[in-house]
A protein has these predicted regions:
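Charged, amphipathic alpha-helical oligomerization/scaffolding segments
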Residues: 17, 21-24, 28, 53, ...
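Primarily heptad-repeat coiled-coil rod domains in cytosolic scaffolding/tethering proteins
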Residues: 6, 10-13, 42, 49, ...
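Switch/coupling subdomain of P-loop NTPase systems
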Residues: 1-49, 101-103, 112-114
């Protein structure tokens, strides 16, 4: 009967012997399975150390092939390693962006200057640039190739610190500024001369005057520690700081005022400008309003912006002339080659 007693099972006498035989065969089958497994276990146990060793080797081989496959997909190269804590990225591309769409950039740090201050408009590529540097540093230290041109040089840091993005904490009731400052305090406690520090919108989220002053003081502290640092900002005070302090350099993300769109090109040695007045004029804001707005800005700032605008115009003109000269050089070389071929 069943365990509940509600059902009775009847076995005809004619199949009792066959059922007993079936039961015996099932038991024999189970015993044979256990015997075979025990024998196989014994065989495996005798070479267990070899199997475990091979497993480790296969894992390393799989990892190496995976890195190679990733390198091919990113069109990456093996960076030259240096011990001087220098970064020299040639046509570096953010590894997570479409390789056919991302704009390559030349980024260098540590040889002529230890701190790079990047300015420019929002959505111009500042954050992508500093993330590229941070990812390249971590990829290098992980034994990965980097998506850049041959001749790019990287180094190994004891730590790569980064404060990027706006991570407000509702649970801890932290504002944007407090959230950033909490991270920065932790970074300054741990930073050494062998560290790379990355700040995004340093000093943002509070009064601009106090924020700029704090940003300068923080950069000075990082410099005193001897670390390499890249920071993005909108503050003119930081541009002036980079212009006047040794081992600190300005950089800007290029913006095309005519098309009102960023080019995503990084220009090291050139302070960026907000382009707010030019953009507003292009969008139709009346000139007298723009002129009135300029009256509310410190005269020194206006003069600096005018100088930057002239520098940018001269740079663009020089870039165009250089491109034309290179094209002319190619045409001359082609004509010379054709002439030499005909003489032969």
């Amino acid at each position: 009967q069943s365990s509940s007693g509600a059902t009775l099972f009847i076995e005809p006498m004619s199949i009792v012997e066959m059922n007993n035989e079936l039961r015996k065969l099932k038991l024999d089958e189970q015993e044979e399975i256990e015997r075979i497994l025990s024998e196989l276990t014994k065989i495996v146990g005798e070479v267990a150390s070899d199997i475990l060793s091979n497993q480790v080797i296969l894992g390393k081989l799989d990892f190496a092939f995976a890195k190679g496959k990733l390198s091919l997909a990113m069109k990456a190269i093996e960076p030259i390693l240096n011990e001087e804590k220098h970064i020299n990225i040639k046509n570096g591309r953010h590894p997570l962006l479409d390789v056919n769409k991302v704009v390559p950039n030349n980024i260098y740090l540590g040889e002529d200057f230890d701190t790079l201050v990047i300015t420019g408009p929002n959505t111009g590529g500042k954050t992508v640039t500093i993330k590229t540097v941070g990812l390249f540093a971590l990829m290098t230290q992980s034994g990965l190739h980097i998506p850049a041109d041959y001749g790019s040089s990287m180094c190994v840091y004891d730590n790569v610190f980064a404060d990027i993005g706006d991570e407000q904490s509702i649970e801890q009731s932290l504002s944007t500024f407090s959230s950033h400052m909490t991270k920065i305090v932790g970074i300054l406690k741990e930073v050494t001369s062998d560290s790379l520090v990355i700040f995004d919108e340093l000093g943002a989220g509070t009064d601009p005057v106090e924020g700029a002053a704090l940003a300068i003081a923080i950069l000075e502290d990082v410099n005193m520690a001897g670390a390499k640092c890249i920071a993005t900002t909108h503050y003119s005070e930081l541009k002036n700081y980079a212009l006047t302090k040794p081992r600190v350099e300005n950089a800007a993300v290029e913006f095309d005022v005519n098309t009102l769109s960023p080019t995503y090109k990084l220009l090291i040695g050139v302070p960026g400008k907000s382009n707010a007045f030019e953009i507003s004029r292009k969008l139709g804001l009346k000139d007298y309003i723009i002129d009135r707005a300029k009256e509310f800005i410190n005269t020194d700032n206006i003069e600096l912006e005018d100088v930057l605008q002239n520098v940018e115009k001269n740079r663009i003109k020089a870039e165009q002339e250089r491109a034309e000269a290179e094209q002319l050089k190619k045409e001359i070389e082609y004509i010379k080659t054709e002439y030499d071929r005909k003489l032969e």
